[in-house]
Amino acid sequence: MSLEEQQSDDPAELESGVSRGDELAELLGDLVVGREEHLNAPGLVIRPDEVQDALFKLRDEAGFDHLSCVTAQEYEDRYESIYHLTKFDDRTDEVSVVVPTSKDNPVSQSAEPVFRTADWHEREAYDLVGIQYEDHPDLRRILLPETWQGHPLGLDYDQDRPQIATLREHANPLEEDHRAGDSNTMYINIGPHHPATHGVLHVETVVDGEQVVDLESDIGYLHRCEEQMCQQGTYRHQIMPYPDRWDYISSGLLNEWAYARAAEDLADIEVPEYAQIIRTMGAELCRIASHMIALGTFALDVYGDFTAIFMYAMRDREIVQNILEDLTGQRMMFNYFRLGGVVWDLPEPREEFFEKIRDFMDGLPQALEEYHDMITSNEILQARTVGTGVLSPEVAKSYGATGPVARGSGIDYDLRRDDSYGYYDELEWDVVVEDGCDNFSRLLVRMREVEESAKIIQQCVDLLEDWPEDERNIQANVPRTLKPDEDTEIYRAVEGAKGELGIYIRADGTDKPARFKIRSPCFSNLQTLPEMSEGEYIPDMIASLGSLDIVLGEVDR
């Protein structure tokens, strides 16, 4: 897409004829030293020593209160950090703050004083690309061991060089701080192999008696540089299998849609309406399966309920998994989406497939009523969740929390409605929000979202049943080899089961991305754990971790 086309089709064009980029550039004044045009947003180039001034102005005067993610990359002549900003109350209003730094001295101001979520995102940028961030409170590696040599996404990184890092060499600042001076506290390792972490997560915890006084999540045990793997694959054929492995529990189609949406907008591919309905139905089935396992494992964590809620939830999830297997041919790693549509039509005989879905939907209201009864009448669960793990809306926004974590704190934000895609804007459903801001509210959001997903699925089934046979077009006409224009950039996101799952792609004119960035909702949501846990008891911290519903494959990528 040419620059002229980008400007004429700019969704942020104002009635006065002044573009959104011009308006924001005028607001920032001399802070802006250049302009770029990304497909999703205007790009404002800022000096590396004026990042905080620019971000404070955009947040406080223009209302950009959501830092979605930070993309770092290396060019032949410079390094670059991109801060993807938007608003919780207007998701379609976006701006990219582009911060170039020199090859000889890749140092930039940290955004952490403005947005707390920049803490982990900038640590990841330093870890994988090598950019230094001044004023960062704790700039060290986050996904790789501290003793790792080089930065894997750098242009001169030697991928063939073997490296070994022992546990003894792995830095643990929290333990050192605890041991310094006189202290009555105790240091506890929770994980990396522990049932309550639901994956390979190391929660470094300092306690005073039974109360948590300090906490840090040590991640990266499942890191395999998925972004680099996607950069080595072709748009058309080789990238799509990877998203299934990020949130590998139940959210495969939701993950695939994140990549599909970004690549389709990048290459200007229009998906047929029939395929969009199939995508929407499949995505909501995945959402139900994901929320069911979140509900069951949360009850298991909080009061050891293995026989009732946990097994009931796993039973219902199993029914959904069987439906998804009928649809995609795979039980877990679906690889069902294709750029421009889906790989094949609904299974035959269609009547049996629809009947299986309807049977499950007919029994779902009674099942959810039983879940509600078991949860609201359980005194142990109520005591452990109501008023614990409190996350205020202001703190949640600063950390970039999204999905049920944000909506459980009263933040009315859902990309299916606020930046609609697929077939969601044609269907009747509601965004679920709870204002309790605690562990119980996050649990209720997921249970109520299952009801809304069921509404969406039923409407999709009704549409698909009556769809004329000669109009069942499952794929657009997509070139065998996709080569988007050089230096075309885009960030697109979908509403995953855990929150905002976003993809940034920069094209270089070849059939492979020059940069592929994954914005993981679990990565941002996990940052909030210390805010929810410090001052609470250890069992409450376990409940707070469970209420985040993280999957380590998506956190570590």
Curated annotation (Swiss-Prot):
Glycyl lysine isopeptide (Lys-Gly) (interchain with G-Cter in SAMP2) crosslink site(s): K517
Location within or outside the cell: Cell membrane
Any one Pfam family match given in the protein's UniProt record, by short name: Complex1_49kDa
Keyword Lipoprotein: no
Function per UniProt: NDH-1 shuttles electrons from NADH, via FMN and iron-sulfur (Fe-S) centers, to quinones in the respiratory chain. Couples the redox reaction to proton translocation (for every two electrons transferred, four hydrogen ions are translocated across the cytoplasmic membrane), and thus conserves the redox energy in a proton gradient.
Family named by the database record: In the N-terminal section; belongs to the complex I 30 kDa subunit family. In the C-terminal section; belongs to the complex I 49 kDa subunit family.
This protein's name: NADH-quinone oxidoreductase subunit C/D
Source organism per UniProt: Haloferax volcanii (strain ATCC 29605 / DSM 3757 / JCM 8879 / NBRC 14742 / NCIMB 2012 / VKM B-1768 / DS2) (Halobacterium volcanii)
Gene: nuoCD
